[in-house]
Amino acid sequence: MLYAILFLLCALAAAWAVVALAHWHWLLGVPVFVLVFALMHAVYVLIWWLLTLPVDRSKPLEKQNPRAREACRGVGRFLCLYGGLRPHISGEEKLPTDSRFLFVCNHRSMFDPLMVIGYLYKWNISFISKPSNMAIPLAGDIAYNAGYLPIDRENDRAALKTILTAADYMKRDLCSIGIYPEGTRTKDGELLPFHSGSFKTAQRAKVPIAVACVRGTEKVKRRLLLRPTDVYLDILELIPAERVCAMSTAELAEYSRKRIEEGLKA
């Protein structure tokens, strides 16, 4: 609701700018719209950050903050809109509505998690992300309150702690968890090797794994607002919890990678 109001206010501001600058050139209204939209969204994020305080990152969350979750959704939708994404999502019916799950997907662009956050809001998926993302002022605190976790792959002990915390969140029905097993974005479109350790999260929590693939987000950076970009997120399969616990993490990584590889070729 608040996000809809924000968009309406920005649209009205842009319309006013077009009228005010009409004696110069109507195209001047375009950068004004973008600037006003960005500034108002910054105010939106600041307000939600104030509403989610205080935050103590040294301890796991006892309860997810719904205002922080809504703020993440707003940011995700805004950036997808700003980037000109035209999302096409299939296979949502495969995602469970009665249990938490581990969301596993390939990684092509910064827009990958934003699309999930903005458009799969119903399933309450929080991501394990690199520490630099969680260190962003204001945004990092909001993300932490929404259940997002940093993982330092260079520090095995810290990485294990994150995996155990993520499993605990799912056990306590706080949120589902999303990971990108490649560990980083692919630069040439080819699927990178999967880190098997992250699959321990699902085994510890005894939850199913939703395997998905994303296509087209790597094109967004080249286009931005010039023209919309069709992007595709396909939910390929839900691996039942019983099967997850019966397989090794290496087998889960190999199987998930194979399914994603097949999905990208389809």
Per-region residue spans from a language model:
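Non-catalytic C-terminal accessory region of glycerolipid acyltransferases
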Residues: 160-266
